[in-house]
Each structure stands twice: as C-alpha cells, then as structure tokens.
A protein has these predicted regions:
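Short catalytic-loop micro-motif centered on adjacent basic/acidic residues
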Residues: 55, 76-77
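Loop/helix-junction capping segments adjacent to catalytic residues or to phosphate/diphosphate-binding pockets
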Residues: 25, 62, 83-84, 223
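Catalytic binding pocket for nucleotide-activated donors in carbohydrate/polymer assembly enzymes
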Residues: 70-72, 78-220
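Generic recognition of short, well-ordered alpha-helical segments
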Residues: 29-33, 88, 224
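Histidine-centered catalytic/metal-binding microenvironments
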Residues: 3-7, 17-19, 204, 210-212, ...
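Long, K/E/R/D-enriched contiguous segments that form extended
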Residues: 1-65
Length: 225
C-alpha cells in the first residue's frame, strides 16, 4: 500500500521482533528468516523506509526486554485464541504504558477484564469460535480467493524477496493447513491495526489510554503476589 500510494498520510511505524527458535523447530526458523528477508527489502526501499521499518532483535532475553519494554508504544499479543499459555510479557508492556493489539487469549483475557474493549485493540476469533469453525470446516483457500489484500501477502511469500529467498513452503502451509487460523484472523487484525493508527494520531486520547493501562496494571505486580 505504501508503494502504491506513497503520498497517503500514514503513521510511521517500526516493527521490532524478538524471538528464538528451538533447534528442531524448522517452521520457526523459517519465520525468523522471513522476518529478516522482509527487513532487508523494506529498510532498503526509498519509498517505504521513512514510513515503515522492520528490525529483528537477535538473542532475545531478559536484559534486552528491559530496554525494549519501556521504549515500546504498542504491544502485539496476537496468538490464536485458545493456543497460548498465559505468560507475563504482555503485562510488563502494559505496566510500561504500551497499548495492546491482541486476541482474547492467554493473559490478554485477564488484562481485558481490567481494561475493557475501549483501552485495547482487540481482534480475531474467540476460543469457542475457533473450536466451532474447526468443527464445521475451515477452508483457508476460500479466504485467499476472496480477499485481495490477503492474496497479495500470500503471493508475495511465493514470489520471494530482494534477497532471492522464496517462502512458498510457508505459503502452502497457510493455504493447506492453517492450524492457527491466521488467514481467518487477517482482516480483523488489519482493522485493529488501523484503529490503533487512527488513535495514535489523536495524541491526547492515546496518552489517556496509556495512563489507564499503567494505572490498572497494579493487580499484576509482583509486590501484590
């Protein structure tokens, strides 16, 4: 979209990815490679690089998180509902004033009980909807066929990036065995990202939401436990 309409008014963004892959987790290693391919192409593009950047932070660990969490304005907690063990990273971002783009999964559910819809940017299926859709039959190919934006993303994975690496294997996995229903949640995620960007442009509202997140995070503090 940036390349097609470079003059559009957009909130500049930097996406920071911090992750590790277990030695035998081949798909996770491919996703990390994909992030780096994206970063190489986007960050070198004279049209995109002033509006969008991608950074992969190697060897993600506690000492790195201690710098990252206070500096972040947005926390992406996007696991498929019903799939994520309840962690605490999202709460640490909340305590530092970052606003959450996320699903109702894991500890996001507990945060949502304190914040409500109005202080988070929620998207995606709920856990019971995931179960029902799987039972009734989920066909990601149909979503690919009817969603132009989604189709462009999948086709880009197949075509590859400026470093010459193609991710046809990941594209096929999404189309044939989308275990985490990523394609189902795609349009909802894009809408949440747009709501987040629109809110960020209204600085007073954004700052108010950030302060509410900080104020209501006290229940998650280690001191209370």
């Amino acid at each position: 979209e940036i390349r097609e309409n470079p003059q559009a008014d957009r909130v500049p963004r930097v996406f920071l990815f911090g992750a590790k892959a277990a030695p035998g987790y081949a798909v996770a290693k491919r996703i990390i490679r994909l992030i780096n391919s994206l970063a190489a192409e986007i960050n070198a593009d004279p049209i995109c690089r002033d509006r969008l950047q991608v950074v992969f932070l190697e060897n993600y660990r506690v000492s790195l998180a201690e710098h990252l969490m206070p500096a972040s304005e947005v926390s992406q907690q996007i696991s498929t509902a019903g799939k994520e063990a309840s962690g605490t990273g999202n709460m640490k971002f909340m305590m530092n004033g970052a606003l959450t783009v996320g699903t109702l999964d894991g500890a996001n559910v507990e945060m949502h009980e304190r914040l409500g819809d109005e202080n988070m940017f929620l998207f995606g299926l709920h856990a019971d909807e995931v179960v029902r859709l799987k039972r009734e039959g989920y066909a990601p190919q149909k979503l690919y066929a009817r969603d132009e934006n989604l189709r462009a993303v999948i086709d880009k994975l197949k075509a590859g990036f400026s470093d010459g690496v193609s991710y046809d294997d990941l594209a096929s996995r999404l189309l044939m065995n989308d275990e985490y229903m990523l394609l189902q949640d795609f349009a909802s995620y894009c809408a949440a990202e747009q709501r987040m960007a629109d809110t960020y442009a209204r600085s007073e509202e954004w700052n108010r939401m950030s302060l509410i997140n900080i104020a209501r995070s006290g229940i998650f503090a280690a001191d209370r436990a």
